[in-house]
Design a protein with these regions (language model features):
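DNA/chromatin major-groove-contacting recognition/catalytic segments
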Residues: 165, 177-196
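Short, basic (Lys/Arg/His-rich) helix/loop patches that form interaction surfaces
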Residues: 5-7, 112-165, 172
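Short, cationic motifs built from Arg/Lys/His that form the positively charged side of catalytic pockets
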Residues: 13, 26-29, 59, 64, ...
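A short, basic/aromatic helix-end/turn motif that makes direct DNA contacts
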Residues: 33-44, 154-157, 164-171, 178-181
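Conserved tyrosine-mediated DNA breakage-rejoining catalytic core shared by Y-recombinases
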Residues: 33-76, 84
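Basic, Lys/Arg- and aromatic-enriched nucleic-acid-binding interface segment
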Residues: 1-28
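Conserved hydrophobic/aromatic "anchor" residues
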Residues: 78-79, 150
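C-terminal catalytic core of Y-nucleophile DNA break-rejoin enzymes
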Residues: 58-78, 92-117
Length: 196
């Protein structure tokens, strides 16, 4: 998505969606417009210590705040700049992920389609560069895969409670079961063939 956006600004939205889903461990529904929730730029906020947050409506209609890492800021600013160049009415009340034609935010189905197009572009690029085996993972990737990948990469460096809160898990046990125990199974599998 990064390469596509660097060469064609129409892919800025794809890059933003992919970065948000992976980095903030979002469910696709948390970026989508629903009858009871319209994700908007005003849902980004800063606390008194200067920490960045994003307010989302998650599973079970529960509102939660997700910590926004500094590394995501360039992607946010890049997409804001693009959106401002496309719409003179762009502002804090604008949809977080807007349609190219029409008004308002996007549905989960529309977001999935955009991400899939990004995966398809990545797949073709990787194949063209000779990374055929690695490219196969993108053929099977989903929006939820981005959430899982982001969380799996971060689980070793963040407290379990913080991960559970950002993931929107009601229980740390869920986070432990999905990310820690599965990591231990993988560790055991990779460790079986060690030599004495």
């Amino acid at each position: 998505a990064q390469t596509a956006a660097d060469t064609d600004q129409t892919h800025e939205r794809t890059l933003f969606i992919v970065a948000m889903l992976k980095t903030l461990y979002l469910r696709v529904s948390e970026l989508s417009e629903r009858p009871n929730w319209q994700p908007a730029w005003k849902h980004f906020w800063q606390d008194s210590d200067g920490n960045q947050w994003l307010k989302v409506l998650g599973k079970g209609n529960k509102i939660r705040d997700i910590s926004v890492p500094s590394a995501l800021s360039p992607y946010i600013q890049r997409y804001q700049k693009y959106r401002a160049s496309q719409s003179p009415n762009f502002g804090v009340n604008s949809a977080l992920v807007a349609k190219n034609r029409g008004t308002g935010g996007m549905t989960s189905r529309q977001l999935r389609r955009i991400v899939q197009q990004g995966f398809d572009l990545g797949y073709e690029k990787m194949r063209a560069e000779g990374f055929t085996d690695e490219a196969k993972a993108l053929r099977e990737a989903t929006t939820h895969w981005l959430r899982h990948t982001g969380a799996s990469q971060d689980i070793a460096t963040r407290p379990l409670k913080h991960m559970a809160d950002d993931l929107g898990h009601a229980s740390m046990g869920t986070t432990d079961q999905v990310y820690i125990q599965s990591d231990m199974k993988e560790r055991a599998r990779s460790g079986k063939s060690r030599e004495v």
